[in-house]
Structure formats: structure tokens, C-alpha cells
Amino acid sequence: MTKKPENPGSAGIRVLKTRIKKKSGLKESSRRWLQRHINDPYVQRSKADGYRSRAAYKLIEIDDKHHLLKPGMKVIDLGAAPGGWCQVAAARTKSTAENPHVVGIDYLEMDAVPGAPVLLMDFLDPDAPQKLAEALGGNPDVVLSDMAAPTTGHKRTDHIRTMHLCEVAADFALSVLKPGGHFLAKTFQGGAENELLSMLKKNFRSVHHVKPPASRDESVELYLLAKDFKGREAGPPSGGSERPVDVSKDLSARSDSEGPGDAEG
């Protein structure tokens, strides 16, 4: 199991603290964010381990505890860029280029992930489910989403925007998952999710929040974990059958690619 680094060198890497000078020309908030990012032990570990982002360790830690990913399972990663979660899922499902078990989807271009093809399109496009099923060779056992809306600094607004992404991801998962499948998605603390929780509890046998050690202590970030999908006979998604008006292209962003003031990576 991956443990939270106690210090920057706990992963076997000798790291020197880096300080960004106040006269660097950056705004103070940007300077603080950059300094924290550079000195983050998960960022340093991700470089040493070959992961594209520190967010990879969030999925590793959640999977170590909750056992979502197993060899041969089919997985869809929504908003896959830059590819850290695809890397983890591909390794744990034993996905290969010849026999892919993991497919990512994102309208943002990204480098190819070995063993995990990525479709360059919006997952809300009408033909996305069919194209994903074709790429996987069937419906998924797991749907993942680490999407978050770029933050505005207004906590209530940020929560609502990211919750909307979580809701449309959940509706997508309900439309494609195999019975017994699992759904994992980023959300923020802050309420306004009773309808989503009610819908998930109606359609999955286990629903709860998780916060992996790789999520910063001060972050409002949480993950919704819904396990053991009951199947589509349990009832249609509530309130999510209609496509929102162009919100995903305005809001969707893999949080680990954001800069100062944005969601945690």
C-alpha cells in the first residue's frame, strides 16, 4: 500500500527544498503555489516513478484500500489528460496495446499512454458511449473521473461547478456500467449533493466518500466511491438524461494540470 510521504525524501529520493524568490516577478499567490508544488513530495515521487501527475497516487491509495481495479477489468477514464490515472489503471488491469482494458477520453490532447488508448472527444458527445465500448470491446467494469472545474476563488461557486461535472459523470457511468461495476469521481466538500447521493444510493449497493492521503490536508477535495452497480433495471438516472448546454468544454479540467488558485492536483 502506498503511504503518505512523511518528508520529501521518504520515497528514497534525496530532495532539497526549493524557494522561489519574492523578486521573481510572480504574483504572491503564484509564487506560493509554485513553491508548494515544487516541494510537494508526491510531485517529486511522481517524477521518479514515471507518473504524469501526483494525482496518480490518489487512485493508487484508493485502489489499495477499496480494490476497484483487477486484471482483465474494463475501465473508462473520463477527462483523462494528462494521463496519470490511465497509467495506474492500465498497470493494475494488465492492459496492453494488443488487448486494451483501459480507455481514456478527453477533448484535450495528451501524449499516448502505453496500454490505454485515448479518444480525443467530449464524453458527453452522443456517440461517445458507442466509441468507448468499441475501443474496450464491451461495457466497462469501472468508470473513473478526476475532473474538476477551474476554481474562481468563490468556494460556493467552485463547489457547484465541480459538483455539476460529478453529476454528469455519474449519469454517464449509469448509462454504460456493467452490473456489479464501480464509479469513482472527484467532488468537493460543501453540501448541495443530496440529490446526487440519493441517485447513487438507489443504483449502487455501497456509496461513501473517501479522501486518500495524497489529497492535501487543507484541500476540500473528496472522492465519491459507488460500488456494485445494481444494473439499469434499478431505474433511470435522475435529472441527468439531458445534455447540459456546452458546460463541459467550459468547466472540465484535469485538476492536476491546473496552476495557482485552481483545484488541487
UniProtKB/Swiss-Prot annotation:
Sorted keywords for this record are: Cytoplasm, Methyltransferase, rRNA processing, S-adenosyl-L-methionine, Transferase
Q: Where is this region: Disordered?
A: 230-265
The record's SUPFAM superfamilies line, in alphabetical order, gives: S-adenosyl-L-methionine-dependent methyltransferases
Q: What's the EC number here?
A: 2.1.1.166
Pfam families to which the protein is assigned, alphabetical? FtsJ
Name the residues annotated as catalytic in the UniProt entry: 186 (proton acceptor)
Gene Ontology MF term list: rRNA (uridine-2'-O-)-methyltransferase activity
Q: Report the InterPro entries cross-referenced here.
A: RNA_methyltr_RlmE, RNA_MeTrfase_FtsJ_dom, rRNA-MeTfrase_E, SAM-dependent_MTases_sf
List the subcellular locations: Cytoplasm
Task: Enumerate the catalysed reactions.
Answer: uridine(2552) in 23S rRNA + S-adenosyl-L-methionine = 2'-O-methyluridine(2552) in 23S rRNA + S-adenosyl-L-homocysteine + H(+)
Q: Does the keyword Ribonucleoprotein belong to this entry?
A: no
Spell out the GO cellular component terms annotated for this protein, sorted alphabetically and separated by semicolons.
Answer: cytoplasm
**Residues holding S-adenosyl-L-methionine:** 83, 85, 106, 122, 146
Q: What is its main location?
A: cytoplasm
Sequence ranges of Basic and acidic residues compositional bias: 243-257
> Function of this protein?
Specifically methylates the uridine in position 2552 of 23S rRNA at the 2'-O position of the ribose in the fully assembled 50S ribosomal subunit.
State the similarity comment.
Belongs to the class I-like SAM-binding methyltransferase superfamily. RNA methyltransferase RlmE family.
Task: Report what the protein is called.
Answer: Ribosomal RNA large subunit methyltransferase E
Organism expressing this protein natively: Mesorhizobium japonicum (strain LMG 29417 / CECT 9101 / MAFF 303099)
The encoding gene: rlmE
